[in-house]
């Protein structure tokens, strides 16, 4: 599971399940008519990313369900697409994600993080919730690096960041983001197209290899 921040500044919990199948990435919100077209497009992009990264020598034999938990008034926009992809990678690799860090940011098929709107409101909204519950130095927000120039945060947030009670992580790729969220290297392919053992991408690929073998039976 992973936390994203909605346009209102309120966090929303996203859960992801992955298992053997051929349906690809299933957007539960879309299945029940709670997903806008922009959000649905963002979910389709995730399959493109997974296919290019992991399915060069094996078929992408995967079913994955993505759900905004306890959200019943609809979802639109693509600012949660990177969050959904982190959830997919976490589920496939079985490496847990830090639940104290909220995420916002769009992603393209190449894994590049793209800017979003309302970055200040999103950070300040999540900060207020963390402050009410008690800041302990583990809380923070991950944003697209392009949005750094848009930051005009209130004094409370700035002071908390200075005192290492709250953190803002600016990332440009999915690989950078998953390392912040898990504390584990993402893993780059070597010249033979293999991921380093123990990395997030290695473990995700190994899981997908198992799925592919099951689908062959």
Where are these regions (language model features)?
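Short, small-residue-biased leader/transition segments that mark boundaries at the very start
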Residues: 1-5
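Short, flexible loop/turn motifs enriched in small residues
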Residues: 7-11
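Peripheral, non-AAA+ core regions of ATP-driven protein-machinery
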Residues: 12-34, 38-217
């Amino acid at each position: 599971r992973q936390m994203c921040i909605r346009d209102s500044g309120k966090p929303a919990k996203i859960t992801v399940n992955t298992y053997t199948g051929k349906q690809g990435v299933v957007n539960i919100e879309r299945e029940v008519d709670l997903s806008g077209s922009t959000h649905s497009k963002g979910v389709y992009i995730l399959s493109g990313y997974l296919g290019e990264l992991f399915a060069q020598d094996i078929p992408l034999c995967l079913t994955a369900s993505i759900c905004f938990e306890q959200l019943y008034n609809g979802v639109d926009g693509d600012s949660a697409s990177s969050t959904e992809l982190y959830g997919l990678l976490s589920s496939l690799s079985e490496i847990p994600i830090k639940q104290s860090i909220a995420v916002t940011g769009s992603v393209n098929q190449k894994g590049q993080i793209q800017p979003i709107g309302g970055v200040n409101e999103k950070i300040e909204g999540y900060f207020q919730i963390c402050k009410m519950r008690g800041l302990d130095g583990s809380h923070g927000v991950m944003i697209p690096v392009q949005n750094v120039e848009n930051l005009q945060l209130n004094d409370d947030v700035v002071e908390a960041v200075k005192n290492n009670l709250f953190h803002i992580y600016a990332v440009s790729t999915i690989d950078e983001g998953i390392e912040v969220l898990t504390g584990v290297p993402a893993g780059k392919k070597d010249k033979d197209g293999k991921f380093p053992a123990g990395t997030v991408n290695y473990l995700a690929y190994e899981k997908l290899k198992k799925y592919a073998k099951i689908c062959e039976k």
